[in-house]
């Protein structure tokens, strides 16, 4: 229905771009979920030799989802851009490009919301009928809801989160492209000018080097021989940290390649600062989420201590810690936006009606998600480890196997929180950039926040 509306009222080729984005998002989710359901049994088998042996198998299963999301999102956008902007040079080419992101958003809505509701409904239902009514352990094969619970982990936490981050990633790439196109009122044939090419290609170039860095970082995730949970956590995060380090260096190189000249260093330096600001904020958000959700740090230990007095204090303690954790994340996002704006202003004050600071904010969102491939890999690892524990329980495997999978599952709960932080923060920064793109597209000269019709637009901004 949405594709038909786009074809009738906006641009027929926009419907093609919309459907293409939706298909790629759904394909990434299907591929990742299919592999996750195959990797969980292998993880259970490897857990017989300890968590260190099972960890890399679960991670590699999650890596299929991670690189499917990042790879298809980037490849799809490049195909749409090359086809409609560079080859066909159609009218409204950049509106067609933005429709690609809308298609990804549509699938994300259904996958994230629908999958999340199913996941929690199955999880709570299985616990109520099993633990409360029947008094049997979690994942016991006598409880038929166990299967629904395990399926829900894949639907919500693999396909759902993957679609969410696919949409965030595609949106973060489209935001600076549409901002440049609408602010400078570019047509497809004008996109080949030297300055315009650099501004339009820079976001995709950063995403490309981030993808390569993620692939290199993923090879470094190995279980080793230690069974200590801290060592396992370090092994899992090693790939992410290395990928971010490589991306940081490559970002500087790309910025100087596209914007550098013999007598001007402000433009590449400023844009590199903007992207690196987003990259550092993304890393810091991950560490913040880890601090508040990992059993290695005081917040979770305090909640565990409060459990000794009953469920009420546990719930209150968990809610309070969750609310406190938001403060640090908000401060980090504000700092990241400020640094990105300063970097953009350092790069250039104004090109036409394109503000350098706003462009800096737009590319900062790409910095946050540049290493999306390895971030989603770490996130999708969690449901695989959780399912492995369920399989161990249903198969009546020895207790040490379940202990090994529980160790991996505990780590997976933390990594899931990290991915949620990435998704929300990047979406917030991307939304800010897209709002300015909207402003340029409809010709708003100013915004009066006291007017009820704030988002109403007409052909003439003064109507």
Region locations from a protein language model:
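Hydrophobic packing and interface segments
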Residues: 1-458, 462
